[in-house]
């Protein structure tokens, strides 16, 4: 993927998150993770980013409820772990879901950089899964993946956008259909 900060500056727009490559794997704080990485094209960098929560402000807008719940949301960035070709042993600084970061600089996408193979062996991290429109294609597959997910958050990747929501809220609001929301 292209570097979102570069393009936000070029076209003078808001800077959005650069989370594009969910792994569907979550980790716990202090967990040791093995990551196997194939050939990285010359001049490119690859890393993992662990995304959890931020916030913690009270949802009491009138300041009348001393028992108001803390409001947290998913963070747009988190701890980053640089990867090299071969075996990488990482100790997680915090909990969260893992995203692969392979963002080329400037207009580097025009050079069509080669994909990088990354594998996290079974027994490392916990598989939560995610829905990818390009691969899974149907509401039935979405419903199956969402029903099997165990982490607090669930990721849905469409063609031009990505949702990263509370899994239980998704089960309440959209337990069996997501395609209409992706195609907004």
Q: Where are the regions a protein language model picked out?
A:
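Catalytic cores of extracellular degradative/oxidative enzymes
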Residues: 143-148, 152-184
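Beta-strand-enriched, solvent-exposed domains that form extended recognition/catalytic surfaces
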Residues: 1-132
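A sequence-composition feature that detects small, non-aromatic residues
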Residues: 8, 68, 75, 114, ...
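Low-complexity, Pro/Ser/Thr- and charge-rich linker/hinge segments at domain boundaries
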Residues: 119-155
């Amino acid at each position: 993927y292209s570097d979102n900060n570069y393009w936000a500056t070029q076209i003078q727009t808001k800077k959005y998150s650069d989370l594009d490559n969910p792994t569907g794997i979550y980790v716990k704080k202090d967990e040791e993770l093995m990551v196997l990485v194939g050939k990285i094209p010359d001049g490119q960098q690859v890393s993992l980013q662990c995304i959890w929560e931020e916030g913690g402000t009270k949802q009491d807008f009138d300041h009348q409820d001393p028992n108001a719940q803390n409001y947290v949301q998913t963070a747009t960035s988190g701890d980053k772990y640089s990867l090299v070709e071969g075996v990488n042993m990482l100790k997680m600084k915090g909990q969260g879901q893992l995203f692969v970061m392979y963002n080329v600089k400037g207009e580097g996408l025009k050079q069509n950089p080669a994909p990088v193979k990354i594998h996290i062996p079974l027994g490392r991290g916990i598989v939560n899964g995610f829905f990818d429109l390009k691969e899974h294609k149907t509401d039935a597959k979405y419903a199956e993946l969402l029903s099997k997910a165990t982490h607090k958050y669930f990721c849905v990747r469409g063609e031009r956008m990505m949702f990263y929501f509370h899994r239980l809220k998704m089960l309440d609001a959209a337990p069996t259909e997501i395609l209409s929301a992706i195609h907004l």
